[in-house]
Amino acid sequence: MLEREVRANLVYRSFTRIGGGKVPDDTVINKWALALGPEVIEDLHKRVVTIAQDKQIVEGRKMRIDTTVVETNIHYPTDSSLLGDGVRVLTRAMKRIVAIAGNVGAKLRDRSRSVKYRILEIGRAARSQGGAGKEKLQQAYRKLLEATSRVVGQAKRFSLEIASGVKKSSDVFQQAAMEGLRKELDTMAPRVQQVMQQTRARVLGGDTHVDGKLASIFEPGTEIIRKGKASKPTEFGKMVKIQEAENQMIISYEVYEKRPSDSALLVPAIETHQEQLGRVPKLVAADAGFYSASNEKTAQEKGVKRVCIPSRNTKSADRKKEQKKPWFRKGQKWRTGCEGRISVVKRRHGLNRCRDKGDRGMRRWVGLGVIADNLINIGRVLARKDKATAPIVA
């Protein structure tokens, strides 16, 4: 898409310094993006914010903050589908090993078809109601777990035989490919075993709270996050903080390895604001999830004059009166714009779902989306200023 846009647009050609030259292929552009680490993207973002401050687009008098979930690129996780994924990946790797090394050592038995039938059987049993349906479901899961266990055991034997030299190739490049496949088996087999463990606990033991629960064998860092949304009660991805100043400029973003409490993010956000813009904001606005008495006190001690964060459970008449004052309501009205900004970056810049892989890919994806949105907002503000200062022609 980027290649097509740049190729047909003279403004984009000038901006990217391509001019009349050949536009790089989309695969080359993707490789360039992947070569940039998330640390480089963060430095670029800080530079963009500094430019916005130099051009007086952002002053740092106000700050608003919110969190959202950026989903990883996975299908909806069910125990049976995750087990099916594991069998498919392990079997595919073992088939490639056999194609390289031949039929030496442990023989490959392809259980993909039987696993597929078990998954279909689970789907039919899950639609049945009553005790008989539950018993059928458990029986189908037992068969699926047994087949998956045999595939995992086979994958471990293949890995050991490659390491010991039983399965090998005289070709250097083929041997290197086989070593890569062994690493894939060593990575995926423990993940599949973890899925087997959580499946046994949930389906056979009734325990839905298993430590280290996997939502994907391809994106093991995916968190299961429930934010209470009616439209999407459960999301699978990473929690991301979006922090803004004036003119919808995102001055800070952060992807969290583990979901933190919103209230734990407020004070560090004020410190980040001060570090980035060189001043403490006069007004801080956030939703009720960021409120705590200690947060409000610390913010005021740091120099924030107006903390516009409502208290959910207050019974104090003075506090209720404070939250009805015009300045507080105005601050909360401005705060709702953060939700709109998050909606825009999700729709316009792809932050609804990360297409990159891994935690570093998530940080890179979010950072590039934030930079793109900031550049658009900088351009709009500068265009508005130029229009305001342009001489009126009679």
Spans of features found by a protein language model:
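DNA-recognition alpha helix
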Residues: 2-15
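Anion-binding and metal-coordination hotspots
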Residues: 6, 21-23, 29-394
